[in-house]
């Protein structure tokens, strides 16, 4: 057995898990995106050609990594030092409670905690060492459990991020 650190994991599926035994695994998929099929003909052609180019040994170009493992580790380390001020943490908690009590959207404790790491990472990537409510915008892809929750979660978060636009 060779132990290897899991740095990141990406997955794709045509359906969401319905079997309760998969809930713990699904809960660990932090960012979630719903993507529709490609309906536009020109975009489908781009998709097909890209697939065929990647499969062809004559045209297949080596994938270029845009960030090194060391850079990723540095970002992860720096994010741990980002301060989340008490007022931001209070708004974070209030938003979660609003989702639960007003909208019956339950965010697991794991996702509540990992959401804080998302705020810290957002701040670092924006060049800040303090998280703000503006960082909440990334939680729109973290806090939903069912597709029907997506819009509700998005609107609740945007009311906090940009209260004047939401009115």
Task: Tell what function each PLM region has.
Residues 1-65, 76:
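Canonical AAA+ ATPase core
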Residues 98-110, 124-167:
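C-terminal engagement/docking regions of AAA+ P-loop ATPases
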Residues 38-40, 67, 84, 107, ...:
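Short coil/turn linker and secondary-structure boundary residues
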Residues 58-115, 123:
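Conserved AAA+ ATPase small/helical "lid" subdomain
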């Amino acid at each position: 057995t060779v132990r290897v650190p899991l740095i990141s994991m990406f997955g794709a599926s045509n359906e969401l898990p319905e079997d309760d035994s998969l809930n713990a695994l699904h809960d660990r998929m932090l960012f979630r995106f719903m993507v529709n099929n490609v309906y536009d003909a020109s975009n489908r052609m781009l998709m097909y050609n890209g697939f065929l180019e990647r499969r062809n040994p004559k045209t297949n170009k080596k994938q270029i990594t845009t960030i090194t493992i060391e850079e990723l580790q540095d970002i992860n380390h720096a994010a741990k030092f980002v301060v989340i001020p008490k007022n931001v943490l209070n708004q974070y908690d209030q938003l979660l409670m609003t989702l639960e009590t007003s909208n019956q959207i339950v965010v697991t404790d794991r996702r509540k905690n990992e959401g804080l790491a998302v705020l810290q990472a957002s701040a670092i990537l924006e060049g800040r060492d303090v998280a703000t409510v503006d960082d909440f915008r990334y939680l729109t892809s973290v806090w939903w459990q069912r597709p029907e929750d997506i819009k509700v979660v998005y609107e609740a978060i945007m009311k906090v991020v940009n209260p004047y636009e939401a009115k």
